[in-house]
Amino acid sequence: SAPKDTVIAYLPQHLMTEDGRTVFEETCQAFAHLHETEAEINRINEELTVRTDYESDEYMALIEKVSALSEKFYAIDMTHFEEDVEKTLLGLGFKREEFNRPTSEFSGGWRMRIELAKLLLKNPDVLLLDEPTNHLDIESIGWLEDFIRESSKAVVVISHDRKFVDNITTRTIEVTMGRIYDYKATYSHYL
C-alpha cells in the first residue's frame, strides 16, 4: 500500500486575500487545489487516449498517477461545497449580503476570518492555529469551538485565550527546555 499523505494547514498571521475577488469567491479558493487536480486528471486521461505504448513503463506510470489523483479527488465530496462555504462564512460572522462585496472593503480582521474559513474548508489532516480568536467575536469563537470539537482532525493551537483552549482541548502538550510533556487532559486540568 502507498504511504498516506498528511495534509497540514496553517493559519498565517499575514493576510493572503486577493483584492478584486468577492468574499465568496475568495473563500472558494479553498477548493482551488481540487480544480487543479481535476485539470491534471483530464490532461493525463487525454494523453492516455492518444498513446499506443500500453506495455511501456511510462504508460503504466501515467495509469498509476491518474488512479492516485482520481482516488484523492473523488474521495472529497464537492457536491455541497457552496453550502459549506456559506455555512462557514456565516459561522465566522459574515452576513449573506456581504458575500458579494470585494475583500478589499474589509479590515484586516475580517480578511483574517476569510483566511480562517478557507483553512477550515480545506479539511486538512492536521490544523495549526496561531491565535485564531484574535479577530473573532464571541459568537464566532463559539462557532469555531463547535467546529473544532466536531472535527475528527488533529488541531494544534497556540493561544492566549484560556477559555477557548480549555473548550477545545482533550490533550495538552507542554514544550519546556527542549522536552515535551504530554498530558491527556484539558488545559485547565493541566494547570
Q: In which residue ranges do the predicted regions lie?
A:
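ABC ATP-binding cassette signature C-motif
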Residues: 1-191
